[in-house]
Amino acid sequence: EIKILTYKQNNIHDFAWFADKRFIVNYDTCKLASGKVIDVFTYYTTPQKEVWKSSLLYAKDAIQHYSSLVGEYPYNVVSVVQGPASFGGGMEYPTITVLSPEKSSRSLNFTIAHEIGHNWFYGILGTNERKYAWMDEGMNSFYESKYQQRQNDHFGQRTEQSLLETFIVEKKDQPIGTSSEDFNEPNYGLIAYYKASKWMTLLEKQLGTAVFNKAMQEYYRQWQFKHPQ
């Protein structure tokens, strides 16, 4: 017997679909400040059950975090999927993200936040990831760092700061506006993610949090479902 499933989603520029008969499926709803309610799903396998036991909470926290600071999540569903160990990292798509297995719930929490954040920075604000990597990875990492700060955690940031300072001294640093293919190894991760995030932090301090938030929310309002560059 053939089973046909049909999926439709407006206002997206990318698509992915995942299936595994072994998936444990968790479901809850998330209520945003406006009163809008969205469906939240997480999918994982038995070996990751302990690490993923709070995955719904992490996903809901991330959706509310980005919605409150940048702009309301426009879709009706968000899903987080555990991929195979060979996958290596996380990959974002509109309304859904896939992650490789994590060693701890702490790292899973922040990986979920980062990948869900890409719904805003790459998904809704459809920048050119390869030409302007900082506009999705840098901006997204900035808001992920705020997510960490809310939980009094600075996961990995001290190491990145030390690396950046070393690269600057050794003159191996590159501008945040460098295109992806022109980054030296390991500058893509260090510059496009971390350095761009620190630049956003300095900009917020210069403008003041209220003005900065208003500017970013206006950017979101004007450019959602478009391709800023």
Can you describe what each PLM-predicted range is?
Residues 189-229:
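Amphipathic alpha-helical substructures
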Residues 91, 104-113, 132-135, 139, ...:
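Secondary-structure capping and boundary motifs in well-ordered enzyme cores
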Residues 82-84, 103-107, 179-188, 201, ...:
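Active-site-adjacent structural elements in folded domains
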Residues 44-54, 129-130, 186-189, 202, ...:
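Second-shell loop/turn segments in exported
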